[in-house]
């Protein structure tokens, strides 16, 4: 499972999850991706379970990139412990996920959109956040359509 090799401090505050992801919100490596729709903590176990589900489905077909890393320690106190006597020990690691963050990417010559969609669907079931499937091809098509509209408008302005 994923966890940092070493950290500056053993324990962290829980923090708040406000706003949307400003980094890691575009497809960088593959053609298909799984994007978070709401905020939450994704544990190292959930990331590993999702990775296994996708890998089993695509077999040796393509490549999977994990775009999140669990770098936040979550501490817990033992059961039936009295109040006080300090903060508990780190029990597991989580990745803080905000809306718009890309969680996984998939690509390769053998990977079709149907295969990628089904593999990502299997991974979605393992995650505690709402997600959606996105494709880099569609993003390119949308931007190219917007560019052609802008070009037509500018040509009409030049004619007048």
Swiss-Prot record:
Residues 138-148 have a biased composition (Polar residues). Residues 138-160 are annotated as: Disordered. One of its GO terms (cellular component) is ribosome. Residues 149-160 have a biased composition (Basic and acidic residues). It comes from the Bacteria. Gene3D superfamilies: Ribosomal protein L10e/L16. One of its GO terms (biological process) is translation. One of its GO terms (molecular function) is structural constituent of ribosome. Keywords: Ribonucleoprotein, Ribosomal protein, RNA-binding, rRNA-binding, tRNA-binding. InterPro entries: Ribosomal_uL16, Ribosomal_uL16_bact-type, Ribosomal_uL16_CS, Ribosomal_uL16_dom, Ribosomal_uL16_sf. Belongs to the universal ribosomal protein uL16 family. Part of the 50S ribosomal subunit. Binds 23S rRNA and is also seen to make contacts with the A and possibly P site tRNAs. This is Large ribosomal subunit protein uL16. It comes from Prochlorococcus marinus (strain MIT 9312). The gene is rplP.
């Amino acid at each position: 499972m994923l966890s940092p090799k070493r950290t500056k401090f053993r324990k962290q505050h829980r923090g708040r999850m406000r706003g949307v992801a400003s980094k890691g919100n575009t497809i960088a490596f593959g053609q298909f991706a799984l994007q978070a729709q709401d905020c939450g903590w994704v544990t190292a176990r959930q990331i590993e379970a999702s990775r296994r589900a996708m890998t089993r489905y695509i077999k040796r077909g393509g490549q999977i990139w994990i775009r999140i890393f669990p770098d936040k320690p979550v501490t817990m106190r033992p059961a039936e412990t009295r109040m006080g006597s300090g903060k508990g020990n780190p029990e597991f690691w989580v990745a803080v996920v905000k809306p718009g963050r890309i969680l996984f990417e998939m690509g390769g010559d053998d990977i079709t959109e149907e295969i990628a969609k089904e593999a990502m669907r299997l991974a979605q079931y393992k995650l505690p956040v709402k997600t959606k499937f996105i494709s880099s091809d569609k993003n390119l098509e949308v931007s190219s359509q917007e560019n052609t509209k802008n070009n037509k408008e500018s040509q009409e302005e030049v004619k007048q």
